[in-house]
Structure formats: C-alpha cells, structure tokens
Amino acid sequence: FLPIIAGVAAKVFPKIFCAISKKC
C-alpha cells in the first residue's frame, strides 16, 4: 500500500464523508 495513496485518501475521504453525512 503506497504512502502517496494513503495521503490522498486521508484528504479526500473526510470531504466525501462530509458530503454524504451532511456533517461538516
């Protein structure tokens, strides 16, 4: 598992979760 992918996922996932759950 590449550290770069982990870094990108760490930045993108919170935004996706925020949009889906509507909890920002």
Curated annotation (Swiss-Prot):
Disulfide links within the chain:
C18-C24
Q: Which GO terms describe its biological process?
A: defense response to fungus; defense response to Gram-negative bacterium; defense response to Gram-positive bacterium; killing of cells of another organism; positive regulation of insulin secretion; positive regulation of mast cell degranulation
> Where is this protein primarily located?
secreted
Provide GO CC annotations from the record. Answer: extracellular region
- Where in the cell is the protein located? Secreted
Family, according to the entry, reads as follows: Belongs to the frog skin active peptide (FSAP) family. Brevinin subfamily.
Q: What's the protein called, per UniProt?
A: Brevinin-1Pa
